[in-house]
Amino acid sequence: MGKFTFTQTEIPGVVVIEPQVFGDDRGYFMETYQKDQFTEAGIDKEFVQDNQSRSTRGVLRGLHFQKNHTQGKLVRVTRGEVYDVAVDCRPNSATFGKWVGVTLSEENKKMFYIPEGFAHGFLVLSDVAEFCYKCTDVYDPTSEGGIPYDDPTVNVQWPDCGCEHKTSAKDKLHEPFAAQKFEYFEKW
């Protein structure tokens, strides 16, 4: 029924996806995933877990990855607005250490595909945001890893959210990007 527009970012494999939205005075309808179209666009993945979070303005989640149960993610916002970021942690990649970001909102309905081998995070720009994502592997607390959101090597340019960033105590403990080897991402 619906068609998707797939736009490759400057980092190969990281894709912004725009669904076709059918709207009228009653509201709207859109497909948020259609395996055949995603496969045709090069995203031939099996998603095994769906997650949802709710956060308030200034919450900065990330930058997260899993070392062993490496996850690809298809993310979108169902309420509010976030700035979403993917950081290439694949040591054999030409874009190793580079990042790309996109604004996702309930208004623009964009989705963001982040492949395995990337760190991922987002900053909430609205009063409240609800964030949904599909993962290619299950959550494994023993595989948790991350990069500081303000790492000087990666140097993500987070937009102004109108308040101080709110991060978890755990996210403040991540080793700097330059101190990590990322050997678990060599196959990606």
Model-identified regions with their sequence ranges:
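Non-catalytic, conserved peripheral segments adjacent to functional cores
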Residues: M1-E107, S126-V128, C135-W188
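Short beta-strand His + acidic residue motifs that chelate non-heme Fe in jelly-roll/DSBH
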Residues: V85, F112, H120-L125, Y133
